[in-house]
């Protein structure tokens, strides 16, 4: 059986936790985990990160968004169908939009329904609306396929264009570091921390919950649009990898990589908060 390093375990950790490895790959990792003091701790961090994401409180959809959509679609033949679709899927779409681009979430959702109406009522399914939303969110030019909400006075469209500038500064993402050579090649440079329970969620811990999800939301905003959408769809909304990949127009390998980057960055953002003092 080939020797597996900690670096190799981390590289496929998301696939391991999602049961996306074949039996041989899983057996190799299990063999390594049985004798490693660091990788089980790291995997525990990643499991907790995914659990925190799945428990993320539902976003509060602004009342103005419904009014903006009603105004944008008023007078159209299928406005009632659009209103029904918004009632059913609006919170889902707004949650994804806030993960991708929180300052433009309302514009993105509004534009989603405008485009769906252009396609016809068959587009008012959750799957198609999500696909349209992500496509709009990835559009560099707000003039191409996106409307500006009548309630938006923040200049957020310009901010979105700036954020997509290839020369703009991008956040440095958290990722474990490893020895590159010598007898310890592939081992963690610093052992992962065992996270405590003092800051984990509980019904009484409102302040701690706000702090925890403030870190999560900040980390999501550091990610690329497609990585943030992948994490939102799979870990927050609970959609399967396969459906998420289809909606984001990603291959199986690309959705795996997006989840890997996103989860590791959020894990890193939570590390200092969840590590006991």
Predicted regions and their residues:
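Short, amphipathic alpha-helical interaction patch
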Residues: 1-34, 55
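C-terminal edge and immediately downstream basic/flexible tail or linker adjoining helix-turn-helix-like DNA-binding
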Residues: 2, 57-71, 149-151, 159, ...
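Amphipathic alpha-helical segment used for protein-protein interaction
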Residues: 7-9, 77, 88, 166-229, ...
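Short alpha-helical interface segments
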Residues: 13, 37-61, 68-73
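C-terminal flanking helix
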Residues: 37-40, 47, 54, 90, ...
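Σ70-family region 2.3-2.4 aromatic/basic alpha-helix that recognizes the −10 promoter
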Residues: 62, 66, 70, 90-91, ...
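A short, charge-rich alpha-helical start-of-domain segment used by transcription regulators
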Residues: 74-95, 102, 117, 123
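DNA-recognition helix of helix-turn-helix
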Residues: 138, 216-219, 227, 236, ...
């Amino acid at each position: 059986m080939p020797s597996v390093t900690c670096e190799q375990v981390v590289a496929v950790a998301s696939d391991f936790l999602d049961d996306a490895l074949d039996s041989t790959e899983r057996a190799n990792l299990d063999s390594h985990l049985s004798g490693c003091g660091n990788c089980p701790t790291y995997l525990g961090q990643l499991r907790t990160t995914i659990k925190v994401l799945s428990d993320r409180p539902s976003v509060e959809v602004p009342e103005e968004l419904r009014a903006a959509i009603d105004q944008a679609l008023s007078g159209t033949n299928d406005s009632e169908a659009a209103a029904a679709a918004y009632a059913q899927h609006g919170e889902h779409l707004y949650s994804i939009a806030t993960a991708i681009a929180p300052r433009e979430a309302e514009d993105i959702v509004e534009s989603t329904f405008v485009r769906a109406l252009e396609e016809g009522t068959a587009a008012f399914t959750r799957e198609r609306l999500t696909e349209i939303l992500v496509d709009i969110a990835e559009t560099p030019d707000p003039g191409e396929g996106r409307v500006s909400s009548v309630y938006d006075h923040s200049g957020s469209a310009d901010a979105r264009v700036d954020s997509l500038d290839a020369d703009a500064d991008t956040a440095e993402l958290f990722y474990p570091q490893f020895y590159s050579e010598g007898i310890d090649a592939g081992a963690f440079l610093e052992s992962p921390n065992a996270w405590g329970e003092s800051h984990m969620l509980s019904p009484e811990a409102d302040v701690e919950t706000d702090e925890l999800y403030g870190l999560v939301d900040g980390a999501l905003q550091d990610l690329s649009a497609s990585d943030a959408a992948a994490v939102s769809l799979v870990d927050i909304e609970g959609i399967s990898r396969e459906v998420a990949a289809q909606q984001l127009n990603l291959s199986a390998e690309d959705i795996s990589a997006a989840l890997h980057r996103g989860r590791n960055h959020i894990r890193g953002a939570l590390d200092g908060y969840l590590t006991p003092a």
